[in-house]
Design a protein with these regions (language model features):
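Beta-strand-rich domains and repeat architectures in extracellular enzymes and scaffolds
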Residues: 2-78, 99-106
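Short glycine/acidic-enriched loop and turn motifs that connect beta-strands
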Residues: 23-24, 68-74, 123-125, 163-167, ...
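A short beta-strand motif characteristic of beta-propeller blades
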Residues: 39-46, 89-98, 133-139, 181-191, ...
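Blade-loop segments of beta-propeller domains
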Residues: 47-54, 67-69, 76-113, 121, ...
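Repeated scaffold domains used in trafficking and secretory/extracellular systems
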Residues: 48-56, 99-109, 142-153, 191-202, ...
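Short, conserved, GDST-rich strand-edge loop motifs in beta-rich repeat architectures
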Residues: 64-77, 161-168, 261-297, 387-388
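Loop/turn-rich, solvent-exposed surfaces of beta-rich toroidal or solenoidal domains
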Residues: 325-350, 360-400
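Blade-level signature of beta-propeller repeat domains, shared across WD40, Kelch, NHL, RCC1
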Residues: 410-443
Length: 443
């Protein structure tokens, strides 16, 4: 099943109503950029916000959501803007959205009921799609930062708090999309979870949720209003105090769960070991840089785990460099039998052939990627960032099959992080990072 060719009943009918373009996190867009033969132009807006993601509701109706990088000083808050997709001018803005003073990126989506939903910190908000006023506000049961917000086929919302190893079990919460009342009992997993959730809707209507834990990947079944752990699918990808770090989000593609570990890098640990999460008495400065050495010696790994047989688990180290680390998950492109992996701490982008059920490095590119990418299977283009030695964060376009660098575009940003790239549907890409939001268009 492919997100870009099947609409999901939980969302407003749009090509990109939610992060990664769909619940399976395949990050694949219809159309093509043809960046190699085009000329790129950039519009950038610089401000004091932590821009996380852009989503589309109606055609041309775009929203950007995020938080504030308020690691010290005045308290943080979440926010959503409706923007002009060409100029990036703000057409409407939400009020400051309470977040329990937790500093983390959160998420937004365009729901089938017409509302814009926003999760940030320990709060969930339902917003009017036109003026972004608050329609409903809900404090979530877990007083921690939350990441990942998905709509399920029945319209209900699901989210989770973020917990590292040794911080107890992560809480998954399911809510009514109108009232934001909690449905059933929140589910506390046997272990913490750092990465965002994914979900898979089968042709027969069965829907399951996938959660990357601190040691296992978990599949959650929906039984009425209740969330139930699937006892038959709990593959282990690491052990306690392992020489590899925790997994970020999973990508569900070709009946396989794709994941990269080594994600709870030093800065992530520091943010989530404070209460409220990400709040410090004095400015933390470079203590929150993702370029710091990894707190383990294991190299970056890519995992391939069958959705039908959890024992069919293949692992590869695409780079082999000690102390690997990332802040965003991989992507799999079934049309090319290729998974894309990277090592943000040490540098390096790799295409990994997934043909015949195996994993084999097909190509390497000497760049330093960190973001959630976008792929265009029709044209074979991968869009991701490269944080350069000069301290600029460029957007690059790469040939999925060969790893050839097709184009490089300066965004005007000097901060890279693990936020989301989004296809605009008109040979364009929206770029979100701390202090910068940009649109790159090819003609």
């Amino acid at each position: 099943m492919r997100d870009r060719t099947s609409s999901h009943p939980g969302y407003w009918p749009s090509a990109w109503p939610v992060e990664c373009g769909g619940n399976r996190r395949q990050k694949a867009s219809p159309g093509r950029l043809d960046a190699a033969s085009g000329a790129a132009s950039v519009i950038s807006r610089h401000d004091d916000k932590w821009h996380v993601m852009a989503i589309e509701r109606n055609s041309g109706q775009w929203y950007v959501g995020g938080t504030m990088a308020a690691f010290s000083g005045p308290p943080p808050f979440g926010w959503v803007e409706r923007i002009d997709p060409t100029t990036l001018d703000i057409l409407a803005a939400s009020p400051r959205l309470p977040c329990g003073e937790h500093v983390w990126c959160g998420a937004i989506l365009a729901h089938a009921n017409g509302s814009i939903m926003s999760v940030n910190g320990n709060h969930l908000h339902r917003l009017d799609p036109d003026d972004l006023s608050i329609l409903v506000e809900r404090r979530l049961p877990a007083d921690r930062s939350h990441n990942g917000l998905l709509a399920l086929a029945d319209g209900s919302l699901i989210t989770k708090d973020l917990r590292l190893e040794g911080q107890g079990g992560t809480t998954l919460t399911r809510l009514d999309p109108g009232s934001l009342e909690i449905l059933g009992q929140p589910l506390v997993l046997p272990e913490g979870s750092m990465g965002r959730i994914a979900a898979n809707l089968e042709l027969d209507g069965t829907e399951t949720v996938y959660v990357p834990g601190t040691e296992h990947l978990w599949r959650i079944q929906l039984k009425g209003d209740e969330l139930v752990i699937d006892a038959e699918w709990q593959p282990r990808y690491r052990t306690t105090d392992d020489r590899f770090g925790l997994s970020w989000d999973a990508c569900l593609s070709d009946d396989v769960c794709w994941a990269m570990d080594c994600g709870d890098i030093t800065s992530v640990r520091r943010i989530h070991q404070t209460e409220p999460n990400g709040r410090f008495g004095t400015p933390p400065g470079r203590d929150l840089s993702w370029r710091l050495d990894a707190p383990w010696d294991g190299p970056q790994r890519l995992h391939r785990i069958s959705l039908t047989d959890p024992t069919a688990h293949v692992v590869i180290e695409p780079f082999g460099t000690a102390g690997g680390g990332i802040i965003a998950p991989p992507v799999h492109v079934p049309e090319f039998d290729m998974a894309i992996a990277w090592d943000s701490i040490n540098g390096g982008l790799a295409g990994v052939s997934t043909a015949d059920g195996g994993l084999e490095v097909a190509w390497h590119l000497d760049v330093r990627a960190s973001m959630q990418p976008v792929v265009f299977p029709e044209s074979g283009e991968l869009v991701i960032n490269d944080f350069t030695a000069a301290g600029t964060d460029d957007v690059i376009v790469v040939d999925i099959a060969t790893g050839a660098l097709l184009d490089r575009v300066a965004t005007g940003s000097r901060i890279a992080n693990g936020m989301f790239l989004t296809p605009g549907g008109n040979r364009d890409i929206f770029y979100c990072s701390t202090l910068t939001v940009a649109r790159i268009a090819w003609s």
